[in-house]
Amino acid sequence: MPGFRFLLAATAAFLATSPALPLSADSLNAGNIRLVDPEETVPVIKIPDGIYLRTPNDPDDIIWARVPEFRVEMVMAPPVHPSVGLRYRDEYPEQDLVVQLARTSERFYVRLRWVDPTRDMSTLRDRFRDGAAIEFSESDDSVSYMMGTDAESPVNIWYWHPDGDRVESLAAGSPGSLTRLDRQPVTGASEYRTGHGPDDSQWIVVMSRPLASEGDHQVSFERDTIPVAFALWQGADAQRDGLKLVSLNWIFARMTPDAAPAPGN
């Protein structure tokens, strides 16, 4: 089986110097995780051909140890609807989201991780589920990062929630216009890691989609840079709908691929 042996050798070489992925939430503030400011540009790392995740969206695959992590500050979204204003509280804490962006010749990947002391899996009468999303401008950064500008300047949103470990591809042209798209090409998987204490527990989520886009409002990756933004929902804090944590303005994902670091570098 020479082909299989070649893939094993290529994977081993790619991962030869990979550090172990940290389990502690303290690593969210580690010195090697650079804080990204709004409107900064970050690379989408190219995973070499012949290197594969163990499963299509494996959150714990060692390949992620070769992809740089970036830290994004998340703050409470301003209330954009009276119903959100009624639930809004200034004391909601800010928090960090750690982001990794990667691609192969066929797929685009995003990996997110964040501290969450509680694993909130579903929405019931007085309980709410956790969630995370990445938002893509369908054109450029003139589009509002707060759910799009209008029907002519929309955004594509990948929304993950743990109820069934599902990812949905959505579109919006303004707050309150969120629509589930007919085509659902985005897939994902998650892992909840329990640490030594509540502040050491975290969600890790991977979402991905084929690079080729089919259907209306599915983001095109055939661009040098793509404006992206992020959102989190902490179910234990009764966050849902527009009551959420968001990144401040767009961050630019550079699709002109940077190769993953070679072993020994």
Swiss-Prot record:
Signal peptide span: 1-25
List of residues binding heme b: 81, 147
GO terms of molecular function: heme binding; metal ion binding
Pfam families in the record: EB_dh (PF09459)
Any one Gene Ontology cellular component term annotated for this protein: periplasmic space
Keyword Heme: yes
Compartmental location: Periplasm
Cofactor(s) it depends on: heme b
Keyword Iron carried by entry: yes
UniProt main location, coarse: periplasm
Keywords recorded for this protein, A-Z: Electron transport, Heme, Iron, Metal-binding, Periplasm, Signal, Transport
Cofactor notes: Binds 1 heme b (iron(II)-protoporphyrin IX) group per subunit.
Cited InterPro entries: Cyt-c552/DMSO_Rdtase_haem-bd (IPR019020), DMSO_Rdtase_II_haem_b-bd_su (IPR017838)
Oligomer status and interactors: Heterotrimer of alpha, beta and gamma subunits.
Role of this protein: May transfer electrons to the iron-sulfur centers of DdhB.
Protein name from the UniProt record: Dimethylsulfide dehydrogenase subunit gamma
